[in-house]
C-alpha cells in the first residue's frame, strides 16, 4: 500500500502529521518542531523595518499601542468627535479583548451568510445577532467582560449626550 501523506519537512523520515502555524512546514513530532537548527522561521530572522517604531506589544498580548492607529479618523463626524475627545475610549480600545469582541460584532454586521430561506441574512437579523452577542458580554451576560461593559457604557453615555 502506498502512503499518500506528506513527509516531515524537518527530518524527512516519517509522515508529517502536524503543520507549523508560522511557516506551514509539515513535521512529525514535537522534537522536530522544536529543533532550532533544522526548523528556522525566515520571518523571525529578518524583522520588518519600521515595525518596532510603530507597535509595542506588552506582556502576553494584553495591550497593543500603535501610534498609527491613534491618528485614524472614523467614518462619521459624530463618531470621530466622540473618539477624539474621549481618552477613556481610546484607552479601552488598546485592549485586545475589546478589539477582538468589537471585530466580531463588525463581522456579524457585515457578513453575507445564507439563512436558508431568503438567500441572505437581512440587516434586522444581523443587528439582533450583534446586540445579542454584546449582551452576553455585558453585565448579567453569561460571558461578562468588564472592559466591554465599560466601553459600552461610556459610548452610550457619549452618544446620548450628543443626541441631547
Curated annotation (Swiss-Prot):
Binding of Zn(2+), residues: 8, 11, 28, 32
Alphabetical keyword list: Metal-binding, Zinc, Zinc-finger
SS bond partners: none
Source organism superkingdom: Eukaryota
GO cellular component term of the entry, any: nucleus
InterPro entries hit by this protein: Hit1_C, Znf_HIT
Zinc finger region(s), HIT-type: 8-49
UniProt GO molecular function: zinc ion binding
GO annotation, biological process: box C/D snoRNP assembly; maturation of LSU-rRNA from tricistronic rRNA transcript (SSU-rRNA, 5.8S rRNA, LSU-rRNA); snoRNA localization
Pfam families membership: Hit1_C (PF18268), zf-HIT (PF04438)
N-terminal signal peptide: none
Miscellaneous comment: Present with 2730 molecules/cell in log phase SD medium.
Protein name per its UniProtKB record: Protein HIT1
Amino acid at each position: 500500500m502506498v502512503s499518500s501523506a506528506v513527509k516531515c519537512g524537518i527530518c524527512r523520515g516519517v509522515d508529517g502529521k502536524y503543520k507549523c502555524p508560522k511557516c506551514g512546514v509539515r513535521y512529525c513530532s514535537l522534537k522536530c518542531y522544536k529543533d532550532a537548527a533544522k526548523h528556522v522561521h525566515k520571518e523571525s530572522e529578518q524583522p520588518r523595518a519600521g515595525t518596532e517604531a510603530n507597535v509595542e506589544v506588552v506582556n502576553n498580548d494584553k495591550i497593543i499601542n500603535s501610534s498609527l492607529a491613534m491618528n485614524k479618523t472614523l467614518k462619521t463626524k459624530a463618531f470621530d468627535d466622540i473618539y477624539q475627545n474621549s481618552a477613556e475610549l481610546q484607552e479601552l480600545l488598546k485592549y485586545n479583548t475589546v478589539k477582538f469582541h468589537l471585530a466580531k460584532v463588525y463581522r456579524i454586521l457585515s457578513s453575507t451568510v445564507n439563512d436558508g430561506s431568503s438567500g441572505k441574512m437581512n440587516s434586522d437579523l444581523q443587528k439582533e445577532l450583534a446586540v445579542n452577542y454584546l449582551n452576553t458580554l455585558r453585565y448579567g451576560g453569561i460571558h461578562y467582560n468588564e472592559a466591554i461593559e465599560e466601553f459600552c457604557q461610556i459610548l452610550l453615555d457619549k452618544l446620548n449626550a450628543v443626541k441631547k
